[in-house]
């Protein structure tokens, strides 16, 4: 049961990441590469100046990638805390003498609720991420 829930979350997060990459990150990558190419075409610049220029071109993309990574880690941490709470409740039930099958059902139900609750957060997280990405480099 937990594997099914994990797959649901993974597919939703993968779809969100693909959307963000296609609509935001890819454009930023194009800008970064074109900007870097312009740096290299400056025949008057020193090697150090070209390097600094390329670093400046890369900064918005690096900031964007850090933002996406941070948001995904935060989401993952919240989901992990929720499922840990489910595991703790299951262990407490086992310790109290509840039958294993009943504990397994409770655990599955709890994990499903965690996943359902967190699936509802994905659209808001996506919107917030895209808004933040749009403001980077402007």
From Swiss-Prot:
Q: Does the keyword Acetylation apply?
A: yes
Identify this protein by name: Protein FAM136A
Alphabetically ordered keywords of this record? Acetylation, Phosphoprotein
**Sequence similarity:** Belongs to the FAM136 family.
Q: Which PANTHER family match?
A: PROTEIN FAM136A
Modification type N-acetylalanine: residues:
2
Alphabetical list of Pfam families matching this protein: DUF842
On this chain, the residues bearing Phosphothreonine are: 124, 126
Per the record, its GO cellular-component terms are: mitochondrion
């Amino acid at each position: 049961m937990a594997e099914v829930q994990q797959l649901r979350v993974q597919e939703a997060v993968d779809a969100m990441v693909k959307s963000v990459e296609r609509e935001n990150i890819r454009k930023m990558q194009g800008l970064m590469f074109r900007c870097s190419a312009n740096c290299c075409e400056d025949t008057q610049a020193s090697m150090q100046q070209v390097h600094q220029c390329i670093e400046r071109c890369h900064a918005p993309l690096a900031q964007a990638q850090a933002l996406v990574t941070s948001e995904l880690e935060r989401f993952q941490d919240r989901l992990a805390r929720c499922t840990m709470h489910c595991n703790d409740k299951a262990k407490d039930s086992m310790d109290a003498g509840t039958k294993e099958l009943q504990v397994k059902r409770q655990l599955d139900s709890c994990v499903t609720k965690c996943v359902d609750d967190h699936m509802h957060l994905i659209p808001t997280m996506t919107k917030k991420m895209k808004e933040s990405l749009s403001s980077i480099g402007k």
